[in-house]
């Protein structure tokens, strides 16, 4: 049986794969496991703007309250806001209903511990055991006054906005910022932060209707933002994903600045301030080779993990690093928050611009992207981890690994959140890489479709 939890919580198509029944059982199990040593635990619950969010919230909260826990609802806020607010309100755990960058039919449920960190695999496994096997036989379901109660926290948005603003001492007067809020969880807080810091703000994709989240907008579709920054003559643009834990930036020329480039410029900024602990950045095996080259040139070490911001965070916590992330835009700044926070990252990027008195193009220019080609093979979700067991696929991978051995690299991996196998090649010839990536991806699709 496939593991219920992926790299970013439980995710699936809402109302079928992620049903209300499953959400209810996740509520019960998480409240029991995450706060088993507390008499009446408190679980903070937030969500993004998806239509299915309120439905799943009701089911999750019912499960939480059914085991005697208290649910505190903060409604629509970014995922990193829940991590912070769980700590601020001293809750025993936090829960977020969101499918991040995925399209509207998907939703997900992920959890934070009382310190605002994503759960380790072992804790997720304990929750999954209860979801699939039921509550422990010695657990007595509460009745009467022992049943839990949901309450709404009205000032959570204000508290998170103030927290983000407190991460900088820089004013943004005279700067023009363009925001793409992905019709998602940042639609209210992002413009508040930048306006209150003094910037002129042009905000787009900030009118969610429950069905338009990530719809040709946000960090996975930044093309329009690039055009807008050029058309408006703005200083910088920022695109968030549906739950605002990712960020893509756009410089004053309308050029996209991805997560690797953001990490490179922030690494140098932190090093200059004496704040880059152990002079090290944590990235993943999918990071561009240009990041390695740039960091080596400036005397900064780089550690690599498997793909997934949870694994980046684990490495950072284990070895005491403060900066890490992924090319996709998850950037973790442990001096400020316990998870990737797109809004805080954006504030740090623009703060670095102000302090250095340089445009973003100059700061991000510290790293030159190596040519890279990527393609996602759409496969049966139950078969996506079997690509390295299929003889035809293994043979093609071996052939390409040999081809790129001395001039680049090949990475093939199953997505932790979608029914896809991701293929990436780095090398000197873009057209040749595009052909090879496409050929391997189509072979994987043919072999691993249902």
Language-model region placement:
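Gly/Ser/Thr-enriched, mixed-charge loops and adjacent short helices
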Residues: 13, 107-232
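Phosphate-binding and adjacent anionic-ligand microenvironments
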Residues: 236, 273-450
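N-terminal small/polar loop signature for handling phosphorylated ligands or for N-terminal nucleophile
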Residues: 32, 36-106, 192-250, 399
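Short glycine-rich phosphate-binding loop at a beta-alpha junction
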Residues: 40-48, 72, 176-178, 279-285, ...
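An N-terminal, well-structured beta->alpha segment
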Residues: 1-62, 66-67, 93, 150-177, ...
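Buried hydrophobic positions in well-ordered alpha/beta secondary-structure cores of metabolic enzymes
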Residues: 8, 45, 82, 95, ...
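Proline/glycine-rich low-complexity loops and linkers
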Residues: 125-161, 166, 252-325, 332-333
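Short glycine-centered, acidic/aromatic-flanked micro-motifs in structured strand/loop junctions
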Residues: 46-47, 179-181, 251, 335, ...
């Amino acid at each position: 049986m496939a593991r219920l939890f992926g790299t970013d919580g439980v995710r699936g198509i809402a109302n079928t794969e992620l049903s209300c029944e499953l959400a209810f059982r996740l509520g019960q199990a998480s409240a029991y496991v995450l706060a088993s040593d507390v008499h009446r635990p408190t679980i903070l619950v937030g969500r993004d703007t998806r239509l299915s969010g309120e439905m799943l919230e009701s089911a999750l909260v019912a499960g939480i309250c059914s085991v005697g826990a208290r649910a505190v609802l903060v409604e629509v806020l970014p995922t990193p806001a829940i991590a912070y607010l769980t700590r601020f309100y001293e809750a025993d755990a936090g829960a977020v209903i969101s499918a991040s960058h995925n399209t509207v039919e998907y939703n997900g449920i992920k959890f934070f511990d009382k310190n605002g960190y994503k759960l380790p695999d072992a804790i997720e496994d304990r929750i999954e055991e209860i979801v699939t096997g039921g509550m422990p036989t010695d657990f007595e379901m509460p009745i009467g006054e022992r049943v839990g109660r949901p309450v709404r926290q009205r000032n959570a948005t204000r508290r998170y906005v103030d927290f983000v603003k407190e991460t900088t001492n820089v004013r943004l007067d005279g700067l023009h910022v363009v925001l793409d809020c992905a019709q998602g969880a940042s639609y209210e807080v992002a413009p508040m932060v930048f306006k209150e810091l003094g910037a002129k703000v042009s905000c787009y994709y900030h009118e969610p209707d429950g069905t338009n989240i990530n719809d040709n907008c946000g960090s996975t579709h930044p093309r329009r933002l690039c055009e807008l920054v050029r058309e408006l003559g703005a200083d910088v643009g920022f695109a968030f994903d549906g739950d605002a834990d990712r960020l893509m930036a756009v410089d004053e020329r309308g050029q996209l600045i991805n997560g690797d480039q953001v990490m490179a410029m922030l690494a140098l900024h932190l090093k200059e301030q004496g704040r880059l602990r152990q002079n090290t950045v944590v990235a993943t095996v999918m990071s561009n080779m240009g990041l390695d080259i740039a960091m080596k040139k400036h005397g900064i070490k780089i550690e690599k993990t498997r793909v997934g911001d949870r694994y980046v965070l684990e490495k950072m916590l284990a070895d005491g690093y403060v900066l890490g992330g992924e090319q996709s835009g998850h950037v973790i700044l442990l001096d400020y928050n316990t998870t990737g926070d797109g809004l805080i990252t954006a504030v740090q990027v623009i703060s670095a611009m102000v302090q250095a008195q340089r445009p973003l193009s100059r700061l991000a220019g510290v790293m030159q992207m190596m040519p890279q080609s990527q393609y996602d093979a759409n496969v049966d979700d139950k078969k996506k981890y079997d690509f390295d067991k299929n003889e035809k696929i293994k043979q093609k991978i071996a052939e390409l690994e040999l081809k790129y051995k001395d001039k680049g690299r090949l990475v093939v991996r199953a997505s932790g959140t979608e029914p896809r196998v991701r293929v990436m090649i780095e090398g000197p010839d873009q057209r040749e890489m595009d052909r090879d990536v496409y050929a391997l991806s189509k072979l994987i699709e043919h072999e691993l479709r249902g």
